[in-house]
Amino acid sequence: MDKKLHFVSPETGPNSNLDLTPQLAQSSSAFLFEPKNIVPFETALGWQKNFQKNLIEQPFSPQAVWLLEHFSCFTMGRGSDKKNLLFEENNSPLPVFSIERGGEVTHHMPGQIVGYLVLNLSLHKKDLSWYLRELEQVLIDVLDLLGMEGKRVDGLTGVWCEDKKVGSIGIGCKRWVTQHGFSLNVDCDLIGFEKIIPCGLDKVKVGKLSDWIPGIKVCDVTPLLRESVKRRFKLNWEK
C-alpha cells in the first residue's frame, strides 16, 4: 500500500454522520459460547452455518456469539485475489480456507481472539455498513478500556493502534442473518502474516496488544469483548 494511511478517530471520518451507539429498539437474546480449547476453523464454520440456517427458518430464535481461538490457518473471503498468497497453493505452510465472507486473505492463530456473531439484523438494523462500524466499535471500546487508542483508517475496514492493524473485520450475510465477525490480535505469533498480504493491503503493518501491554493474555481480553458485544448489540445471554 503506497499511499499514506489516513487515520480517523472513532467519531470522525467518512462515517461521522453515523450514530455509533447501539441501535436496537429493545434487547434480543443470544447464546454465548467461549470454548476453553482451541477450535479447528472448519468446526467453528459448521457451528455458524447451523445457527444461521436455524435463524433464517426461525427468525425469533436465539442468536449466537462465539469468542474463541483457532489453530493456525489462512482464510480467504469472496473474490479474494490469490496474488495475496505469497506461496504456491500446492505448497501452503498452513491450511487455507475459502469462505463466504467479505474481505481478502487473513491469518488466524492461537493468541488471537476471533469473534463470530450470528445475528438477525432484522432485530437490529438492516444496514451492513452500520454493522461493520459497530463491530469496529466493539474493538475500539475494548482498547479504550485497556488504555489504548483504537483508530479507523479512511476507506478501510478494521482497527489500528498507532500505525499497526490489530483488529480485522469480515462478515457474511444471508437474508439479513450474519456470519463471521472480527479478530483481535492479543499475544499471538505474527510470523504467519509474512506469508500473505494481509487483507490485500500491501506493506500494512500488523500488531498485537502485547506490543503495547507486555504480558496481556487472551483470558484478560475475552471478558471485555464479551461485555462490549453484549452492550453494543443489546444482547441478553441465554442460559
UniProtKB/Swiss-Prot annotation:
It comes from the Bacteria. It catalyses: octanoyl-[ACP] + L-lysyl-[protein] = N(6)-octanoyl-L-lysyl-[protein] + holo-[ACP] + H(+). Its EC number is 2.3.1.181. The record marks K165 as: Lowers pKa of active site Cys. Pathway: Protein modification; protein lipoylation via endogenous pathway; protein N(6)-(lipoyl)lysine from octanoyl-[acyl-carrier-protein]: step 1/2. The active site is at C199 (acyl-thioester intermediate). Residues 59-239 form the BPL/LPL catalytic domain. CDD domains: LipB (cd16444). The keyword Electron transport does not apply. Its main location: cytoplasm. Catalyzes the transfer of endogenously produced octanoic acid from octanoyl-acyl-carrier-protein onto the lipoyl domains of lipoate-dependent enzymes. Lipoyl-ACP can also act as a substrate although octanoyl-ACP is likely to be the physiological substrate. Belongs to the LipB family. This is Octanoyltransferase. It comes from Prochlorococcus marinus (strain NATL2A). The gene is lipB.
